[in-house]
Swiss-Prot record:
UniProt xrefs under InterPro entries: Ribosomal_uL22, Ribosomal_uL22_bac/chlpt-type, Ribosomal_uL22_bac/org-type, Ribosomal_uL22_CS, Ribosomal_uL22_sf
Task of the protein: This protein binds specifically to 23S rRNA; its binding is stimulated by other ribosomal proteins, e.g. L4, L17, and L20. It is important during the early stages of 50S assembly. It makes multiple contacts with different domains of the 23S rRNA in the assembled 50S subunit and ribosome.
Subunit-structure text: Part of the 50S ribosomal subunit.
The entry's keywords: Ribonucleoprotein, Ribosomal protein, RNA-binding, rRNA-binding
Protein name: Large ribosomal subunit protein uL22
HAMAP family for the chain: Ribosomal_uL22_B
Molecular function GO terms recorded: rRNA binding; structural constituent of ribosome
Length: 111
């Protein structure tokens, strides 16, 4: 069986989120949690919370055992971009993109 969790509108760019997501793909949940706790990236914290949510969904809604779960799928999509302007010299302005991410994680107990 599978259990899913989604996280939307995270104010971290998708490129940075994918670096963290790639480190835990196809790993056991216990290994993934240990990896995320020791990873020195800002994106690790929201992904860790999302992984814990997916495990809780698997245990509470589907009756799966937490120690048999692994990260079957994790992907990061680009969310809406906030556009801001930075004043520059001679009346110019540079556009600043504040990117957001959507993350979906699926845990499963069967390989």
């Amino acid at each position: 069986m599978e259990a899913k969790a989604k996280l939307s509108m995270i104010r971290i760019s998708p490129r940075k989120m994918r670096l963290v997501a790639d480190t835990i793909r196809n790993k056991a949940v216990s290994v993934a949690v240990a990896t995320l706790k020791n990873l020195n990236k800002d994106a690790a914290e929201p992904i860790l919370k999302l992984l814990n949510s997916a495990v809780a969904n698997a245990v509470n809604n589907n009756g799966m055992e937490a120690d048999k779960l692994y990260v079957k799928t994790i992907f990061v999509n680009e969310g809406p971009t906030l556009k801001r302007f930075r004043p520059r010299a001679h009346g110019r302005a540079y556009e600043i993109f504040k990117r957001t991410s959507h993350v979906v994680i699926v845990v499963s107990d069967e390989k």
